[in-house]
Amino acid sequence: MIQRAEAVLSVLGELQEATECVGLDALTKVAVEVEQVLAPFPLPTAPCSEISSWQGIDAVAHRLYPGDAPTGLLPLVCKGEGNLLFDAASMLLVGSTSLSLELQVRAVVEMLIWKRYYLCGMIDSKVMLQAARFSLCAEESQDMLNLPIQVLEAIFDADVKASCFHGSFANMWHVYALASVLQCNIYSVYPMYNLKIRPYFNRLIRPRIWSKDTEPLTLHIMWSGDLEAGSVFKPHKFVALIHASDLKIGSPNSEQRMPLVKSLELQNQDTQLSYSNLKNKFNITKSTFYRWKRQSIEYHKKSVARYEAKHFFLTSYKQGKLIPLSQFKELFPEIPRSTYYAWKQELVSCCSLSGGSTGELSPGDSTEQDYWSSPEVKKTPGQGSFANMLAFKYEKLEGERNQNVTLMQEAKKSLQDCIVANTSFPYRIFKRKFPGISRSTYYNWRREAMLFIPFKEHSGSSEEGSDADKSQSPRSQMSPSKFDRQKLSPRVRISRRKHRSLRLAYHHRKMLREEAKMHIRRSKMSFIKFKLKFPTVSSSFYWLWRVSLNRKPEKPAVMSNSEESKSLAISPDVFQKIKTQGMFSFDGNIDCLNGQTEFTMPEYSPPDQSTNDHMFVMDVVALANFKAKAKLFLQQRFEEKAFPTFKEFRSYFPLTPRSTYYMWKRALHHGVPLIHA
């Protein structure tokens, strides 16, 4: 043990000397050597059950212990320098603070070697950086939210250098590094205060690597401190938490342990979170208290479920088999689909940063641990087996990828055939036959097929087509041979039994269009009323029917007998007018028209286009105002940090489609304002 302590002190002196150099390059080289020096000294793999340096129960931490944390844990008093993170871990491992200095040195080495992993390669990197932002303040502030990554990296470098000396203060990244050093889980317990930033600190932290054979043990460490202004919590130290049933102090006789158990029960009764204890201290109502308590418990459960799902997703990716969305939803139904694709996109970005030629996801090719590689030189004995393993995984993935490509080609060909035959069906029916195709892919293929001209290949070669375009005569553009070839182009035969549901859907849409057309002909409804009554009918049908209705010529009125007799009266000046005007080429043969009669046709008045255009402009302006109100509503709610869900947004603006809502939401999150007024 003396040799171990001397080795720790010597390597600590080397690290302190290296901190005088600019940057972390010299310190990283020393850290690689320190890791090799400390490698022969093993660390405890199980928590200590007997506390040798017993100093009592921390009453302040016991009062701050939250209600959603694991029950039956007891905060122990630790004395030392700094905020006692490594002292608390040493108390849990060996029952005293004798191991704290070595844990501090090992954590510094871990942070130096795996710096890029902790800053941007870990799944919880964003959460850890948010916790580091808020570690200096007790509430969420705009300055901390806008703190750039370069400033955080500078703070990280300064923290690493400061950790090489006694009495330094640990941050959240020290907790992550300590979990990787001990290869165990650390449950970070944060009091029920500062609720906006509490989720970043109150969480289960997993190590970077751990043994696959056994489940890693879990150490419980709590943030303790003082309460300021009644409800603002200022953390300044860490406290070790140990199970009361496993606690042994000195010799395990019953006389010494009975008072401890009794005092623990009394303190648990006094410090339970109840409305009667808090109503005099804080100005809150009973409903608010129970709502906060319920939300904390629900958030804790959701956080645990989310972390388990994320850890399972990463583990399956490292093993080279990325589970599809359907299987993932069966295992974790509470995780939404958007979260699944967000995690998948993170892994895709990691693969593209590591040097991949494409952005496609190839599980098993590279993992986080391989990407954020250590500056150490890799050992040569395992290179052959590792290469064989990669070759096997590559062959397996190539087979799966070819199978997926074949399936996608089949789905695309099927959709194109249906659109050519004018029997396209919605996405929900398409998904039953091809469940692996996403909605966006379906609509992209559908748009391509709608723009595709199926008779282009039968109309001749490209040279003939170019010559036809150059010719000026319309007869040359439409030759009989080309017309016959277009007319005799093959058509896709459709089975009646297979497409019975499609025909029923087509007839339903047709009847709906006929009903909408009858409504427009009977009553001149506005565009907004039309969309409210028939939301599934396209807007182009509305304007087509309106224009055809207004342009419809009026039928000539049936003349009565008296009007007919009056109209048959021929004036003698008629023929003279015709002669003087020279209307016809046969002016000399006017006498042959003597026996003809002249009918006076009613005057034809063209429809009033000004009224039509005015109504069209009014409808367009109303639609623009409607969209402007929707954009303004979303932008205001986004600035108030109370962004509505699509269900709530649809209740206010029922005509806005879902895709438009998510397009505006994405623009706001990217910093693009919707309304510049």
Curated annotation (Swiss-Prot):
Record localization: Nucleus
Family, similarity comment: Belongs to the vertnin family.
Protein function: Functions as a transcriptional repressor that modulates bmp2b expression during dorsoventral patterning.
Source species of the chain: Danio rerio
Annotated Basic and acidic residues bias: 458-472
Superkingdom of origin: Eukaryota
Keyword Nucleotide-binding carried by entry: no
Region (Disordered): 356-376, 458-490
GO cellular component, one term: nucleus
An example molecular function term from Gene Ontology annotations: DNA binding
InterPro entries recorded: Vertnin-like, VRTN_OTU_dom
GO biological process, one term: regulation of transcription by RNA polymerase II
This protein's UniProt keywords: Developmental protein, DNA-binding, Nucleus, Transcription, Transcription regulation
Protein name: Vertnin
